[in-house]
Design a protein with these regions (language model features):
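Conserved PLP-enzyme active-site core in the AAT-like
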Residues: 2-25, 29, 56-70, 75-264, ...
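Conserved C-terminal alpha-helix-loop-beta "cap" of PLP-dependent enzymes
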Residues: 6, 287-323
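A glycine-/small-polar-enriched, mobile loop at the entrance of the PLP active site in fold-type I
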Residues: 16-54
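Charged, low-complexity, helix-prone segments enriched in Lys/Glu/Asp/Gln
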Residues: 41-42, 49-50, 86, 96, ...
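Broad hydrophobic/π-residue packing in well-ordered secondary structure
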Residues: 45, 118, 321-323
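Residue-level signal for secondary-structure boundary elements
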Residues: 46-50, 93, 155, 240, ...
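Conserved PLP-dependent catalytic core of the aminotransferase class-I/II
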Residues: 62, 264-299
Length: 323
């Protein structure tokens, strides 16, 4: 593995990543084209609201969504999506958060989503939670039973919850004139999800910018209904809403846009085949080793992300090397 002088100077040894696009090890690695675009963006001042608007328009063009917005990570995107459902584009309501007054402020969210920070983030903006189902399963009937006059939105964690169930939740929510927020942070690849999930009718869909998109790790991509995306913008920086502290710089905006452009132009099938071959090479190398158990999940058989193959190695006490 090549040394990295930036980390050497700090006394930190880089890792060999055999885990995936995990936040705690840095997400993904950006392509040279992305870092070059970010460096170029850093050389000029620019009207940030204008850049935010134009980048959003371009991302919407690329994905076919009504509108798009770059957040400071996917968790920030879910929080701002929640704020958008609480305030709409009402400037006074934006200024009052987390005081929601008499507005509907309850989010119906499943307990199968064990990302507690998502639950916390919706409370931070003044929301309350109707947590439904169990840590193992949730049904559309669970969602339906929780809807009341105080409901602001329904939240779906795609991956733990299936696309089929998402469609059912969307149908249920829209029958009650309620929006649906989809946490799809790790649901790329396939890149078709960028287009297909919003096209299902999900009102706000949030992807990580620093996982499979391979943009800046501190970015998220919010796609959805124009009015609600505009409400996300009002609640975020450089405006004076509850999300002011979740700043996205000009460099990150330009970097994520370039990363999305590269992702959409990439030969995804070839990339997935390459990943699968890497897994099979490892299987051939260690599969017969004593004490080593191999569990291979081919592409499109898992949930995080759906298209990625996974190889799990379990080391027993008689394995030649410790785990």
């Amino acid at each position: 593995m090549e040394s990295n002088p930036v980390y050497e100077h700090l006394g930190i040894e880089p890792l060999i990543n055999a885990f995936g696009t995990m936040t705690h090890i840095g997400g993904s690695l950006m392509a040279p084209e992305v870092t070059a675009a970010m460096a170029e963006a850093s050389r000029s001042f620019v009207p940030l609201r204008q850049l935010q608007e134009r980048v959003g328009e371009r991302l919407a063009e690329l994905t076919g969504a009504e509108a798009a917005f770059i957040s400071a990570g996917a968790a920030s995107g879910v929080m701002l999506a929640g704020a958008a459902c609480l305030t709409g584009t009402d400037a006074e309501a934006v200024a009052r958060l987390p005081d929601v007054g008499t507005r509907p402020s309850e989010f119906v969210i499943s307990l199968v989503d064990d990302h507690t920070y998502i639950h916390q983030s919706l409370r931070l903006i003044g929301g309350t939670l109707a947590e439904v189902g169990t840590t193992d399963t949730v049904s559309v009937d669970n969602y339906a039973a929780a809807i009341n006059a105080y409901t602001a939105a329904l939240v779906v964690f795609l991956g733990e919850q299936s696309r089929t169930q998402l469609g059912e939740v969307i149908e249920l929510a829209h029958a009650h004139d309620l929006p649906v927020i989809v946490d799809a942070a790790a649901q790329l690849p396939p890149r078709a999800n960028l287009v297909e999930i919003p096209a299902m009718g999900a009102d706000l869909v949030v992807f990580s910018g620093g996982k499979a998109i391979a943009g800046p790790q501190s970015t998220g991509l919010v796609l959805g209904r124009r009015e609600l995306v505009e409400a996300c913008v009002l609640n975020s920086s450089p405006n004076f809403g509850a999300g002011r502290g979740m700043k996205v710089g000009k460099e990150e905006m330009v970097g994520l846009l370039r990363a999305v452009e590269l992702m959409l132009a990439d030969d995804e099938e070839a990339r997935v085949r390459d990943w699968e071959e890497q897994c099979r090479q490892m299987m051939r190398a260690v599969g017969d080793a004593p004490g080593v158990t191999v569990d291979f999940n081919p592409p499109y058989s898992a949930s995080f992300p759906a298209a990625a193959p996974f190889l799990r190695l379990c080391f027993g006490v008689n394995a030649p090397l410790p785990a």
